């Protein structure tokens, strides 16, 4: 899907066991192992199948609306007075975020495997909407597991999923957020392995999911690289993206990993601060452990019990991160930094006011980091940020906090 990485490349992982260094792998129930191996086999065939790639490209152009534009944020750049700021406009995709890139790829795989039922987990509802969308497009039934807390704070997306014909199952276990939804989806999958395809929405889970999701999302970085060379004649100095599970981030990061002149920063959800437990900064404040089929950085207590975490953004409210991010952090290729709720909220308003773009709260975390860094950089330097989703789904959350009832 991308050009072949060099042997000593940062882009050559994972190995045949799905590991990025000590991270990744396949930690799943025995009943799932044959299915996982089957999926991996099908994925390996699809990667080198010109017909699969052609269909993916066709749907990308005619259904998703790719390539998404590269946009120079003129007023934000002027306001901050430093580096030139460019956005990769993934919020302009069909369904309003980067999630659809992966969903189209995976549903084509599900069809190749003869699966007749789709299940998915969702936090902010963006992946749920994208899954329900592709299921409708290909005429397959779809069940979406969503934490009860998220069902409440993401009402517009719940309605969209139902309109699209999906069954939304609220999950009340734990804190009723993304982790709990993923647990329920895995339970469903174990019970219905024969006919069901689990469409995971982030670059985590058991191998081959982290690799698969990354490859489907790498179209973001590959396009951005070409577009940046066309616009500026060179690569950016800095690439920034928000990181929850990490699919939009790995999608824009991966094509730039071997470009040593490009600094890369992933922005985690700092929530209400790193001192307590009300954040989702797995790399900044977590430790390695196993969750949802892979080894990665997690928010856990001394006994290895998973902490609940918190973020203003439902899509970043996950106590882990994709294993490739854990590895990239350990080897020092990517820096991961936290942004607090209040900073994201401020950035959300700043972008809306200056550029007429209402960003998703997830992307607002990345914008907040850009707002911090741009003024410290030279006017001849360039920042590329992944604007991963639009903020329609977040107006209720933001309205409530700002005291503007909707």
From Swiss-Prot:
Its EC number is 4.2.1.20. Pathway: Amino-acid biosynthesis; L-tryptophan biosynthesis; L-tryptophan from chorismate: step 5/5. Pfam families: PALP. It catalyses: (1S,2R)-1-C-(indol-3-yl)glycerol 3-phosphate + L-serine = D-glyceraldehyde 3-phosphate + L-tryptophan + H2O. Its cofactor is pyridoxal 5'-phosphate. The modification N6-(pyridoxal phosphate)lysine is found at residue 99. GO terms for cellular component: cytoplasm. Keywords: Amino-acid biosynthesis, Aromatic amino acid biosynthesis, Lyase, Pyridoxal phosphate, Tryptophan biosynthesis. Tetramer of two alpha and two beta chains. The beta subunit is responsible for the synthesis of L-tryptophan from indole and L-serine. Essential for production of nod factors and establishment of symbiosis. This is Tryptophan synthase beta chain. It comes from Rhizobium etli (strain ATCC 51251 / DSM 11541 / JCM 21823 / NBRC 15573 / CFN 42).
């Amino acid at each position: 899907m991308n050009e072949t990485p060099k042997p000593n490349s940062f882009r050559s992982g994972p190995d045949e066991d799905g590991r990025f260094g000590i991270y990744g792998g396949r930690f799943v129930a025995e009943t799932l192992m044959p299915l996982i191996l089957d999926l991996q086999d099908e994925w390996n065939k699809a990667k080198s199948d010109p017909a699969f790639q052609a269909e993916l490209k066709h749907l990308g152009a005619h259904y998703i609306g790719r390539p998404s534009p590269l946009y120079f944020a003129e007023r934000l750049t002027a306001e901050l007075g430093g580096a030139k700021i460019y956005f990769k406009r993934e919020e302009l995709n069909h369904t309003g975020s980067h999630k659809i890139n992966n969903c189209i790829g995976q549903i084509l795989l599900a069809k190749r495997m003869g699966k007749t039922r789709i299940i998915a987990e969702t936090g902010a509802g963006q992946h749920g909407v994208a899954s329900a969308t592709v299921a409708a497009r290909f005429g397959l039934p779809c069940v979406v597991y969503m934490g009860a807390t998220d069902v409440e704070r993401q009402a517009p997306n719940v309605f969209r999923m139902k309109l699209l014909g999906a069954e939304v199952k609220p999950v009340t276990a734990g804190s009723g957020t993304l982790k709990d939804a993923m647990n329920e989806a895995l339970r469903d999958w174990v019970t219905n392995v024969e006919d069901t395809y689990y469409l995971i929405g982030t670059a985590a889970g058991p191998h081959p999911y982290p690799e698969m999701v990354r490859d489907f999302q790498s179209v973001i970085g590959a396009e951005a690289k070409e577009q940046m060379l066309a616009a500026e004649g060179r690569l950016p100095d800095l690439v920034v993206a928000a990181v929850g599970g990490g699919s939009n981030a790995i999608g824009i990061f991966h094509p730039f990993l071997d470009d040593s002149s490009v600094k890369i920063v992933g922005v985690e959800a700092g929530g209400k601060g790193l001192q307590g437990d009300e954040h989702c900064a797995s790399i900044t404040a977590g430790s390695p452990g196993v969750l949802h089929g892979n080894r990665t950085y997690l928010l856990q207590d001394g006994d290895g019990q998973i902490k609940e975490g918190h973020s203003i953004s439902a899509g970043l409210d996950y106590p882990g991160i994709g294993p490739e991010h854990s590895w990239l952090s350990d080897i020092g290729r990517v820096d991961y930094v936290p942004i607090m709720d209040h900073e994201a909220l401020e950035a959300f308003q700043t972008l809306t006011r200056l550029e007429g773009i209402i960003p998703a709260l997830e992307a607002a975390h990345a914008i907040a980091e850009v707002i911090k860094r741009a003024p410290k950089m030279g006017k001849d330097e360039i920042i590329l940020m992944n604007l991963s989703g639009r903020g329609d789904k977040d107006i209720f959350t933001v309205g409530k906090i700002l005291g503007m009832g909707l």
